[in-house]
C-alpha cells in the first residue's frame, strides 16, 4: 500500500498546502480510498498520480469544513465522468444529510449510487467497520470539539514466498497450480502425484497497516488504534510552544503526535494538518515542527502536498 497526501494544512489552505485529504492506494489493486475531502481536493487529485475513477471508498473523520467541503464537487465530477459504479462513504451520521442537501440544492443527480455507513456505533463498540478476504478497517473515537474518528486499515497476513525452484525441481509445470500451491492448498497433478502447498511456502508475511488520526488532542484511543502500525499519519496542528492553544482547541502538538507513535510502537510517523501560522518566514517553521517531533519519535517525517510514501 502507499499513501499520497493531497492536503496537509489545517483550517484554511495556503499557497503551498491545501486542506485535508489523503489517498490510500491498495496493494495489488487499482482501488483508491480517500480519507477526508477538503475544499479543492479534486484539483489536487488532477495534479497527482491518483485517478479519480479509482476512488471506491471515502472515509471522513469529522464534519468540520476543511475536511468535507470538497465532497459535493468531487462526487458530482465522478458522476459526470460516468466512470463510477458506486461510492461507499464512511463518516459521522450528519454526513449523509450534508451531501444529500448539497447535491439537491445544486440540482445535481448522480449517475451512480452512494452507500453511506455511519461510523459512530462501530467506533463506540470497537466493531470492524469493513472486512474482506484481504483487508479490514477499524475506527475509534478521537478527542475533538465535535465528534471525530480515526481509521485503521490493516492488510491480512499474506502467503509466504513461494519456492519456485523447488516446484520446478519436482517437475511441476508452471500455471494455475502454482497459484494454488502458493495459497497453501493441496493439489493433485495429472500424473497422480499429490502435493501440499504448505511445503512450498515460507512463513506467512505480516500485512501492512495504516492509521489516520485527525482532528484530535492527545488521545489514548488513538494510541490503541495505532498499536504496532506500520504508518501513523497524525495531525500536528501546533508547535509544543503553543500547547495551551492545542488544549483549548483540542488539536495536537508535535509532541502529542510523537507521543502517540511512541506509545503505540508505530514504525513510522508522518505529521500533517499543520497550522498556516508556521511558515519559513515566521519564527517557527515547518522544519522546526519536524525537529520537535523527532526529539520524541525519531522516525518522523513531515507531510507535504503530493508526497507519496510506501507503507512498509
Curated annotation (Swiss-Prot):
Pfam families, per database record: Lactamase_B_2
Residues annotated as binding Zn(2+) 1: 62, 64, 144, 215
Cofactor(s) it depends on: Zn(2+)
Keywords recorded for this protein, A-Z: Endonuclease, Hydrolase, Metal-binding, Nuclease, tRNA processing, Zinc
MF-aspect GO terms: 3'-tRNA processing endoribonuclease activity; zinc ion binding
Known catalytic reactions: Endonucleolytic cleavage of RNA, removing extra 3' nucleotides from tRNA precursor, generating 3' termini of tRNAs. A 3'-hydroxy group is left at the tRNA terminus and a 5'-phosphoryl group is left at the trailer molecule
Superkingdom of origin organism: Bacteria
Amino acids binding Zn(2+) 2: 66-67, 215, 273
Active site (catalytic residues): 66
Cofactor mode of binding and number, as noted: Binds 2 Zn(2+) ions.
The protein's Enzyme Commission number: 3.1.26.11
Function: Zinc phosphodiesterase, which displays some tRNA 3'-processing endonuclease activity. Probably involved in tRNA maturation, by removing a 3'-trailer from precursor tRNA.
Protein family (similarity comment): Belongs to the RNase Z family.
PANTHER family reported in the protein's UniProt record: ZINC PHOSPHODIESTERASE ELAC PROTEIN 1 (PTHR46018:SF2)
Quaternary state and interactors: Homodimer.
Name of protein: Ribonuclease Z
Gene: rnz
Amino acid at each position: 500500500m502507499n499513501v499520497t497526501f493531497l492536503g496537509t494544512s489545517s483550517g484554511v489552505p495556503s499557497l503551498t498546502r491545501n486542506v485535508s485529504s489523503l489517498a490510500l492506494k491498495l496493494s495489488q489493486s487499482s482501488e483508491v480510498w480517500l480519507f477526508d475531502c477538503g475544499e479543492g481536493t479534486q484539483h489536487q487529485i488532477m495534479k497527482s498520480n491518483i485517478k479519480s475513477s479509482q476512488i471506491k471508498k471515502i472515509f471522513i473523520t469529522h464534519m468540520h469544513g476543511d475536511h468535507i467541503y470538497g465532497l459535493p464537487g468531487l462526487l458530482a465530477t465522478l458522476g459526470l465522468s460516468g466512470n463510477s459504479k458506486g461510492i461507499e462513504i464512511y463518516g459521522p451520521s450528519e454526513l449523509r444529510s450534508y451531501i444529500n442537501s448539497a447535491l439537491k440544492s445544486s440540482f445535481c443527480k448522480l449517475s451512480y449510487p452512494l452507500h453511506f455507513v455511519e461510523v459512530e456505533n462501530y467506533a463506540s463498540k470497537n466493531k470492524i467497520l469493513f472486512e474482506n478476504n484481504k483487508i479490514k478497517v477499524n475506527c475509534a473515537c478521537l478527542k475533538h470539539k465535535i465528534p471525530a474518528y480515526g481509521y485503521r486499515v490493516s492488510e491480512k497476513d499474506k502467503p509466504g514466498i513461494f519456492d519456485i525452484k523447488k516446484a520446478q525441481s519436482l517437475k511441476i509445470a508452471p500455471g494455475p497450480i502454482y497459484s494454488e500451491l502458493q495459497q497453501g492448498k493441496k493439489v493433485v497433478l495429472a500424473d497422480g502425484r499429490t502435493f501440499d502447498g504448505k511445503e512450498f511456502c515460507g512463513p506467512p508475511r505480516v500485512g501492512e497497516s495504516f492509521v489516520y488520526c485527525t482532528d484530535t488532542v492527545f488521545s489514548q484511543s488513538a494510541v490503541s488504534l495505532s498499536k504496532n502500525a506500520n504508518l501513523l499519519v497524525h495531525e500536528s496542528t501546533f508547535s509544543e510552544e503553543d500547547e495551551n492553544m492545542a488544549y483549548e482547541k483540542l488539536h495536537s502538538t508535535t509532541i502529542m503526535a510523537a507521543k502517540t507513535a511512541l506509545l503505540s510502537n508505530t514504525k513510522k510517523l508522518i505529521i500533517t494538518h499543520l497550522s498556516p501560522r508556521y511558515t519559513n518566514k515566521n519564527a517557527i517553521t515547518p522544519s522546526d515542527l519536524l525537529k520537535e517531533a523527532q526529539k520524541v519519535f525519531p522516525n518522523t517525517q513531515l507531510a507535504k502536498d503530493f508526497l507519496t510514501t510506501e507503507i512498509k
